[in-house]
A protein has these predicted regions:
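Hydrophobic/aromatic beta-strand elements that line small-molecule binding cavities or substrate pockets
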Residues: 33, 68-73, 85-90, 103-104, ...
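Short, low-complexity N-terminal intrinsically disordered segments enriched in polar/charged residues
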Residues: 4, 16-51, 149-150
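Short beta-strand edge/turn micro-motifs at domain boundaries
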Residues: 120-148
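Surface-exposed, charged secondary-structure patches
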Residues: 73-114
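A short gly/proline-enriched turn/hairpin at secondary-structure junctions
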Residues: 52-63, 75-78
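Hydrophobic pocket/interface hotspot
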Residues: 33, 44-45, 53, 64, ...
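Hydrophobic h-region of N-terminal signal peptides that target proteins for export
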Residues: 9-16
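Sec-dependent signal peptide recognition
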Residues: 1-8
């Protein structure tokens, strides 16, 4: 029941923000995106990606929904858990929104018996309103520190 109420609240928030002259609630949008990562819902994550999304992390730069979906979402999703963000800066207008801050994540072992790790770093997510008035992730950049053993 709680999940249904939360879903209805999110849907109402996103629907009310779809008017041409209103900005989105970026914190709610990013929490829904992070929630999809934590529930390992690749379909929902990929649904947030713009067709021309760019992803940057260190020397990796991937462009387009297909490449970002395969190389970031599908390859990373099974290796992490408990993703948390701490917002440092955010802003919105009628057509764009961004959030930047720090993240922390559990890095899951690659094989049974190996230790878990802990990762942290900085992030920025840039969202743009699409032609159909839904918000899509247009740019994601992660800069992380070396993974620490737990």
């Amino acid at each position: 029941m709680k999940a249904l109420l939360y879903s209805l609240l999110v849907a109402a928030t996103l629907t009310s923000c779809s008017k041409a002259d209103e900005a989105v609630n970026i914190q709610s949008l990013n929490q829904e995106f992070i929630g999809a990562w934590n529930s390992k819902d690749s379909g929902k994550i990929n649904g947030f990606l713009a067709d021309d999304v760019s992803f940057v992390q260190g020397s990796a730069h991937w462009k387009g929904k297909g490449e970002v979906s395969q190389k970031w979402v599908n390859e990373t999703l099974p290796t992490i858990g408990n993703l948390k963000t701490s917002v440092v800066s955010s802003s919105t207008d009628a057509n764009t929104a961004y959030e930047a801050g720090t993240f922390a994540v559990d890095v899951l072992p690659e094989a049974p018996g190996e230790p878990r790790g802990y990762g942290e770093g900085n992030y920025i997510f840039l969202w743009k309103k699409s032609d159909d008035k839904t918000w899509k992730l247009s740019y994601a950049q992660l800069e992380d520190l070396p993974v620490q053993r737990r």
